[in-house]
């Protein structure tokens, strides 16, 4: 059997759990997470790394999983949208999206939320400009971004109150 036709084991941590995935050498991480790990919250929008719908965190960095060969996940720590909330409550960003109507059709929502969570982890009280820059890799065709932006601003207030 040719090398490219054989699946290879990929060991990584996904949402806090040690995981072994099996993937063909050029399988996209997006597909492996959705189909093999059952983590369907991560969406495919464009499939070209332009829209951010497929965003995940890998070792703390926001990456487009539609462009990432699954083999590159070896030894990494990955967080998908399913790993953002804890067992008892939503993350402040998720709660703010609910309260402020930051989601409509839902395709961009997981990537937007992960981008905002990633931004707040690095910069708990970002300026408006930093929020816009933090969300710049994510496209939305429904909301016009106002509700998304308001949601992130509200999440910043929520994290400030808890600090």
Locations of regions flagged by a protein language model:
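Signature of N-terminal electron-transfer/Fe-S-associated modules in redox systems
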Residues: 1-163
């Amino acid at each position: 059997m040719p090398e490219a036709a054989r699946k290879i084991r990929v060991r990584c941590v996904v949402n806090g759990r040690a995981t072994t995935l099996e993937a063909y050498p050029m399988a996209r991480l997006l597909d492996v997470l959705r189909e093999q790990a059952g983590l369907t919250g991560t969406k495919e929008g464009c499939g070209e790394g332009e829209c951010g719908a497929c965003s995940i965190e890998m070792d703390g960095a926001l990456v487009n999983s539609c462009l990432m060969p699954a083999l590159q996940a070896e030894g990494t720590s990955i967080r998908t949208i399913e790993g953002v909330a804890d067992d008892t409550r939503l993350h402040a960003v998720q709660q703010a999206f609910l309260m402020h109507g930051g989601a409509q059709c839902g395709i961009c929502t997981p990537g937007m939320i992960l981008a905002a969570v990633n931004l707040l982890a690095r910069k708990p009280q970002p300026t408006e400009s930093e929020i816009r820059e933090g969300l710049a890799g994510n496209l939305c065709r429904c909301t016009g971004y106002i509700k998304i932006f308001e949601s992130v601003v509200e999440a910043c207030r929520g994290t400030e109150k808890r600090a």
